[in-house]
Every structure is written in C-alpha cells, then in structure tokens.
Amino acid sequence: MRLAFWLYEGTALHGISRVTNSMKDVHTVYHAPQGDDYITATYTMLERTPQFPGLSISVVRGQDLARGESRLPATLQQVEEHYNPRMIVVAPSCSTALLQEDLEQLSRHSGVDPDKILVYDVNPFRVQEHEAAEGLFTELVKRSAQPQTLTEQPSVNLLGFTSLGFHLRSDLTSLRRILKTLGITINVVAPWGASMDDLSRLPSAWVNVVPYHEMGNGAARYLREKFGMPILSGAPMGVNPTLKWIEDLLAQINDIARERGLPLLDMPDLTEFSLDGLSAPSGVPWFARTADMESFSGKRAFVFGDATHTVGMVKFLKDELGMQIIGAGTYLSRHADWVRSELEGYLPEPLIVTDKFQEISKKIEDEMPELVCGTQMERHSCRKLDVPCMVISTPTHIEDHLIAYYPILGFEGADILADRVYTSCKLGLEKHLIDFFGDAGLEYEDDEEAVGLSTNGHAAAETETSIAGEAATVVSAEGDGMPWTDDAEKMLKKVPFFVRKKVRKNTENYAREIGETTISGDVFRKAKEALGG
C-alpha cells in the first residue's frame, strides 16, 4: 500500500460525497471509524456555499464490535428524523469492508423506508474518486428516471456538474449563457443543484449534454438506451471547439425539431455571444496573431491532469496559440485510451499514464519546458524548478475554488485560458529585470555576497571561505553537479531565472563533452556559443 501523500485522486467516499453534496435532498451516511468525517471540513473550506455538507458518520467503535453491535441503524434513524432526505446513501469504509459487515441487512433494521436507502457497496480499496462518483450518479439516475413527454421547446440536460468540480459554477454559467443565446432551455442540471424529482424529469429533455468525460457519461448512456435520448459529449475549451460544440448541438436539436414538425434553430450572429452584444465573443483569434503572442510559437509546453482538461488544454495550446507540445499525460488510467485517441497526432511521444507525482516532476525537470499546465502538484514541483505553471485540473488549491466568475469552458473561458497562459509565461520577466538591474531592496535571491555553488538547481554545500585575492574561487559541488567558479556563477545569474536551471544543466553537459571538470567563465562562454545561447 502506497503512502497517501500527494495523491491525484481522492477516496471512494470523496467521489460519493461529491455527488450527494451536489444534490438538494440526498444525504450520505458513511459507516467508518471516528475521524473520517474530515470530508465535511473539505467541503466547508473549498466549496464556498452557504449549505453545510449533507454527510453523517456512523461511527465504528471497537467496543461496539466486541459486543457485536452496530451504530448504523441508529444513525439512519437520526438522519431520517433530523434531515428527512428523499434518499440516504450508505457508503462503506475500508474498515467496514475488512469487517465484511452486511450494510444492506443493517440498513433494513433501522426502520427507515427501504426505498429511501441506497447502499452503494463500492469496494473502497479498488475504486477511487472519479469511478465512485460516476457509478453513484448513474445508479441514482437509474433509480429515478421515468418516462416523460418531451418539452415543447428545445431543451437539454447538463450532466456531470458536481461539487468540488474544477471551476464548476463558472463553467455552468458560461454554458447557460450560450444556451440562452441559442434559444435552448435547460431542463435539469445534475447532479449539481438537482433533487430526486429533477432526476425523474431527465427524459423530458431533447438532448443530454455531457461536457466532462469523467462524469455523466454513464448516466447519459443509460438514458440513451432506455429512452432514446441523444448525447452531446465533449468540453468546449477554446474558440474553435466551442463553435463546433454549438454546431453539433444545433444539429441534434434541429433533427428532433424536424421529426416533431417544429421550427429549426438558426446560428445567431457571433456578436450575440459576447458580453456586450457588440463585439466578437472571444479575443483569442486576434490576440494569438499579435507580435507578442506569436513569440509563443517556439515555446514548449507540457500538460498533465484529468482526461477532459488534458485533452482540451493540449488542443488549445497547439491549435489556437501555436505552442509546441512536448508531452502530455493523465492520472486517470481508466480514461487513458480515450485521451490517446483524442490526442492522436498532437503528441511527439506516448501519452504518460501515472498516478505518481514524482514521475511527472522528474519529467518536468528533464525537459524544463517554458510552460506546464497541470494540477496543484505540478505547481509545487514547478515552483522548486522555477518553471511557469498554471493549474488546469483537479486536484487544486483553494484559490481555484473562486467566488468570482472565472470559466474555463466557452468563449469567455478561451479568453481566460489565453490570459493565464500569457501571464504564467510572462510575469517571470519582472523578477528577471530586478535580478539583472538590481533588486531595489527586494530580496528575490539569496545573499549574492555569500560564496555558494548551485548544483542542478539545489543549494550548494557549505564550504570554507576561499583564499582572498584569487581571481576565480572554486567551490566543491554536491551530488552529480560540477564545480562552478565565482565568475561563472555571476554570469549565470544574468540568465533569466526561469531558464537558469536549464542553462546550468546544458552547460555542465557541454563541459563533460569537452573534457572540462570545472565550470569557469571561459567554459560558460564557450557553452553559450556552442549551444546557441
């Protein structure tokens, strides 16, 4: 068993609670040892909604086990009396799975209406966050969806929006605005903000829209098999994907309109999608052709995250900003084949599929790209390497759960992505100018008067002060790095910090090739000329 340190995916409970916490009249009872209610603090801190998470813990205690008792029936009774939800989801923990308790039987002894209880007996050792969330939502839809008459006007369901989703509420608002401009109403958004009654109304919509590959596809496939509902899948990340998403949606809506003898929907003028109703809906097409952005065509980018945002971001960087993609990966092995098929022709090397952050950190250190798009973990790794990084996928920090409007999808999302790419790559110049012309009292670097030596970006070993008067002081290096003289270190400091580690590494490799054992100022100049710096 690996240490649960810096994992990309949460536990099965995390996925279950993302669904139940999204809904209005659903409550989760987690049968687990005391202390596993940490999940409520996670939602309270990150979600930034006025509602308290709908989750209770049925505590498993050693003394109860010794007496052959269980607190689950009593907990279910208390939840029923206090909250009176339409549905209670009972979830096992690793501890109860090891004990092999029969949660179905224990739930029946609670006296609560069995129709109100769903024992989601997922294996917490094998199933993680995304699979658990997708499975539970699909099960709730299967339980609830009932045959319905289609709405008179064109309508859609938006499936897959869940609590703690990446920029969830802003993306939802962005899609709402697009649909309103098209003249399409929203029948149900689920699971976010939906009730069990709302789930029963799902079949009355004309089309099911599923932006996220990880969440909602199982429910959409069930609704297609059971009720013949068409599916529009894919995330509209970027200007061209958004236009294609709109065209595909209109095509599906108009097919149904023809069958019903209703008027067809036309594509509105693009200005109608803009905030002011007068200008272009996105500034990305012209911004990408400015002299400032054209310099990005030579920049190298690496992308890592969940399936949806990895695919969307690679295509956005390559197709709309013209950046060079040096590699991409995902931590969701279940969706790796889909990612490979979507990114065919975009990647110069095989897709990286791993849930070990150390492997991704090593990849970034080896490649030293000009931009990394990843999760909060890549942000930590890049901070140590002085590599620009923007977060584009869960897991995230609290700053990615914003109160303000900050979409990733749609035309407005394309503008925000372009801004984030630009500022992530460019803001480092300010620090470089301060380093180059003087810090004016701002301590961005360590004390430059200290005699030190960096090795592959790490701090130098403590050394004795060198003999005064020597023109070039050589200090021993740590690890695999080569010794650098003081004058070479001073020359290196004039290199922008965000490529400094890369220059150090390339210089040392060059020195080894020509048989040098110490990096002096002369060796540094030769390396610069040879490597085109």
Curated annotation (Swiss-Prot):
Q: Could you confirm whether the keyword rRNA-binding appears in this record?
A: no
Q: What is its EC number?
A: 1.3.7.7
GO molecular function, one example?
ATP binding
Active-site residues, as the UniProt record annotates them: 292
Reactions listed under catalytic activity: chlorophyllide a + oxidized 2[4Fe-4S]-[ferredoxin] + 2 ADP + 2 phosphate = protochlorophyllide a + reduced 2[4Fe-4S]-[ferredoxin] + 2 ATP + 2 H2O
Q: Which residues bind substrate?
A: 428-429
Q: How is the cofactor bound?
A: Binds 1 [4Fe-4S] cluster per heterodimer. The cluster is bound at the heterodimer interface by residues from both subunits.
* Record's keyword terms, sorted: 4Fe-4S, ATP-binding, Bacteriochlorophyll biosynthesis, Chlorophyll biosynthesis, Iron, Iron-sulfur, Metal-binding, Nucleotide-binding, Oxidoreductase, Photosynthesis
According to UniProt, this protein's pathway is: Porphyrin-containing compound metabolism; bacteriochlorophyll biosynthesis (light-independent)
Known SUPFAM superfamilies for this protein? Helical backbone' metal receptor (SSF53807)
Q: Which residues bind [4Fe-4S] cluster?
A: 36
Q: Which cofactor does it need?
A: [4Fe-4S] cluster
**Protein origin, superkingdom:** Bacteria
Q: Which residues form the signal peptide?
A: none
One GO process term, biological-process aspect: light-independent bacteriochlorophyll biosynthetic process
- Which family is this protein grouped under? Belongs to the ChlB/BchB/BchZ family.
Quaternary structure note: Protochlorophyllide reductase is composed of three subunits; BchL, BchN and BchB. Forms a heterotetramer of two BchB and two BchN subunits.
**Record HAMAP family:** ChlB_BchB
- Free-text function comment from the UniProt entry: Component of the dark-operative protochlorophyllide reductase (DPOR) that uses Mg-ATP and reduced ferredoxin to reduce ring D of protochlorophyllide (Pchlide) to form chlorophyllide a (Chlide). This reaction is light-independent. The NB-protein (BchN-BchB) is the catalytic component of the complex.
The molecule here is called Light-independent protochlorophyllide reductase subunit B
Q: Which organism is it from?
A: Prosthecochloris aestuarii (strain DSM 271 / SK 413)
- State the taxonomy lineage: Bacteria, Pseudomonadati, Chlorobiota, Chlorobiia, Chlorobiales
Per the record, the gene is bchB
